[in-house]
């Protein structure tokens, strides 16, 4: 929900469409790609489970920086820092997630297995995006960002407790 509501927040605080396009479409997207590269270099030495926990924790922390503009800290350097931190860590977390999804795919039907896993993740993202505006209308930007952070933290705790490294091709 948080990433979906960040763009409307930027509109509401008065950024121009050009500023938003540059911030999210160019700079933050480059940060996302760099996050994927960094994660790709770190997954083997850290292992899959540790990578997913560390990168998801970093994403949770960076997501909470969305609260800065929600509380009125809206100067451009802060907005760039917030967007870049969030997109960098999303790139890291996504790379770890996709690596594990590939590990969990069987040799008999890897394309189908990966596609099903990816589709479930995409449907979850679409569902969260679909309700984010309604939730924001009810509890505001601050509430959405805090709730998203709480959900992300719970997810990290579940990953740490439930993730089974024995069933992955690499730990």
Feature names for model-found ranges:
Residues 17-18, 107-117:
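Loop-to-transmembrane helix entry/capping segments in MFS-fold secondary transporters
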């Amino acid at each position: 929900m948080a990433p979906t509501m960040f763009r409307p927040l930027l509109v509401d605080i008065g950024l121009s469409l050009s500023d938003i396009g540059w911030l999210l479409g160019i700079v933050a997207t480059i940060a996302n790609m760099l996050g994927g590269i960094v994660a790709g270099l770190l997954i083997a030495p850290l292992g899959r489970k540790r990578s997913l926990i560390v990168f998801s924790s970093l994403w949770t922390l960076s997501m909470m920086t969305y609260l800065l503009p929600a509380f009125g800290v809206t100067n451009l350097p802060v907005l760039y820092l917030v967007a870049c931190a969030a997109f960098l860590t999303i790139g890291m977390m996504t790379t770890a997630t996709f690596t594990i999804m590939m590990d969990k795919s069987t040799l008999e039907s890897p394309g189908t297995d990966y596609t099903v896993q990816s589709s479930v993740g995409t449907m979850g993202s679409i569902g969260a995006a679909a309700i984010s505006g309604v939730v924001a209308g009810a509890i505001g930007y601050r509430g959405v960002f805090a709730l998203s952070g709480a959900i992300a933290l719970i997810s990290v705790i579940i990953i740490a407790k439930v993730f089974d490294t024995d069933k992955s091709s690499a730990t």
